[in-house]
Amino acid sequence: MFARAASVFVLSLPILATANVLPRQDNQCNTGSLQCCSSVQSSSSSLVAILLGLLGVAAGGLTGQVGVTCSPITVIGVSGTSCSEQPVCCTGNTFNGVIATGCTPVNVNL
């Protein structure tokens, strides 16, 4: 009886190993720049509309997430740069750190 249970267990290991293959998100910023933002807002939020108005930027074609009050994160650990707010990868324009467009939150473990 033990031999039968052991053989079932051994034969089922390859099946269990292949059943756990999942795509992994690596949270890297391959396009754009890594920014540390105080908050991330929807491009349709009232705060973003006010900031864009103050900057004189048309919000017509803006979609996705927008980082608010952002500063660039350079090489991690070299200059002591840390981000205690929201690290994001931004592919769009940055307007002197006020906002950054095309942002996606990332986990950089800073």
From Swiss-Prot:
Induction: Expression is induced under conditions of inorganic phosphate (Pi) deficiency. Pfam families: Hydrophobin. It comes from the Eukaryota. Disulfide bonds join C29-C89, C36-C83, C37-C70, C90-C103. GO terms for cellular component: extracellular region; fungal-type cell wall. Its main location: secreted. Aerial growth, conidiation, and dispersal of filamentous fungi in the environment rely upon a capability of their secreting small amphipathic proteins called hydrophobins (HPBs) with low sequence identity. Class I can self-assemble into an outermost layer of rodlet bundles on aerial cell surfaces, conferring cellular hydrophobicity that supports fungal growth, development and dispersal; whereas Class II form highly ordered films at water-air interfaces through intermolecular interactions but contribute nothing to the rodlet structure. Self-assembles to form functional amyloid fibrils called rodlets. Self-assembly into fibrillar rodlets occurs spontaneously at hydrophobic:hydrophilic interfaces and the rodlets further associate laterally to form amphipathic monolayers. This is Class I hydrophobin 2. It comes from Pholiota nameko. The lineage of its organism: Eukaryota, Fungi, Dikarya, Basidiomycota, Agaricomycotina.
